[in-house]
Design a protein with these regions (language model features):
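Active-site neighborhoods and metal-handling regions in enzymes and metal-associated proteins
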Residues: 1-376
Length: 376
């Protein structure tokens, strides 16, 4: 089941513990799926059930400690961890809290994710009980964990390359998948099937839009509206392999493309090309945002950001936006995602996935066509 060699998880933990030492942390408490998977290799769709809480403690030294429901024991014991503590869950009177208290009894300063994009995946009432029963105190460790996850290993990069290639192959089948008269929900279904046939393990994210000359919404579930000549169809997928995401989209014109749609597509292609040529380590996310924004001119949309981190989550820290001063470093993986508004309430988006390297970034996706493709 383990997706990486043990050394991968050891390095992640070792780097985290080094930063913990610098920050004076005795332990870190994790309770969210992405972080627990990142440090342990525990991957399961059972997280779709909100009933049971799951915990992992990263101590100052040694391997992480799992404190989890009994139902997850066998899978967790296949990971690199040595200590897996379980209880019969759900158990309303004590759903793992006493075990956490015991495990944290010697820790004075305990890190907990409290910052942007963080959630507390345990009952708030149980957290208050835990807080009252331990001698230590909780402090925010969000930035510490983000700093570790920000830079990908070559093993992680290789998996993301593979899932990008899977999606590329599915997108390349567009001329055989989409046609005039096809209900949009069937187009989505057929594309999802293509992704699975090409090798995706899961397709947890597939959104898009379609409409005459363009679309006005890119996050709704597909309706039964049929594709018509002159429609612009966009599909955006976050498919996964070994729990790692790709995240990019492609646009097509159905039958024919209007001048407005072709111009919008051309602007986005050129804007993305500027980013692909100019991005370098040492630039800040804000600088990249401003570069893309400037290239789009007055056509820029108000979505708020022009890309984001990518990895074991569909969207990760950081964001290519104003005020994000995160510095790009080698082996970060980010999306380049310019968008623009045009016509009467229409929009268009364009997305590629890249890895920051010494010099020009490495393009992980197959570059979109230079001109808006027309499906006949």
């Amino acid at each position: 089941m383990i997706d990486f060699l043990e050394g991968e998880f050891f390095k992640r933990t070792e780097k985290t513990q080094s930063l913990m030492y610098e920050k004076g942390l005795d332990a870190i408490l994790l309770c969210t799926e992405a972080e627990i998977r990142y440090y342990t290799g525990f991957r399961s769709l059972f997280w779709q059930s909100p009933t049971r809480p799951w915990y992992v403690i990263i101590p100052k030294n040694g391997k992480p400690i799992a404190i989890i429901p009994e139902i997850g024991r066998e899978l967790m014991e296949r990971t690199w961890l040595d200590e897996v503590i379980t209880w019969p869950s759900p158990r309303r009177e004590d759903d793992g809290i006493s075990l956490l208290v015991e495990a944290l009894k010697k820790s004075k300063t305990i890190g907990l994710l409290m910052g942007e994009e963080a959630t507390l995946r345990m009952p708030l009432g149980d957290f208050y009980i835990l807080e009252s029963r331990i001698t230590g105190s909780f402090v925010d460790c969000s930035q510490l964990v983000k700093e570790v996850r920000l830079v990908k290993s070559e093993a992680e990069i290789e998996v993301i390359k593979q899932i990008c290639n899977v999606a590329d192959c599915a997108f390349d089948r567009a001329d055989k998948l989409f046609h005039v008269g096809q209900p949009l929900n069937e187009a989505f279904r057929d594309f999802k099937i293509a992704l699975l046939e090409e090798g995706a393990e899961e397709v947890p994210y597939l959104v898009g839009g379609a409409g005459q000359d363009g679309y006005s919404d890119v996050i709704s579930p597909p309706s039964r509206q049929t594709l018509k000549t002159g429609d612009i169809l966009m599909l955006d997928t976050g498919s996964t392999l070994k729990g790692y995401f790709c995240d990019f989209d492609r646009n097509w014109a159905i039958g024919k493309a209007s001048d407005a749609a072709k111009l919008a597509y051309s602007k986005l292609f050129k804007s993305t090309e500027i980013a692909l040529q100019e991005i370098r380590p040492g630039m800040t996310c804000e600088q990249v945002f401003l570069m893309i924004n400037k290239s789009l001119g007055d056509s820029c949309s108000d979505i708020g950001r022009m890309g984001h981190g990518l990895g074991i989550q569909l969207t990760e820290y950081p964001s290519l936006m104003l005020s994000d001063q995160t510095v790009l470093v080698e082996n970060m993986i980010i999306t380049i995602e310019p968008s623009l508004a045009y016509g009467d309430g229409l929009m268009m988006v364009h997305e590629e996935n890249i890895c920051i390297r010494d010099g020009k970034p490495e393009l992980l996706t197959k570059r979109a066509a230079e001109e808006l493709p027309v499906l006949i």
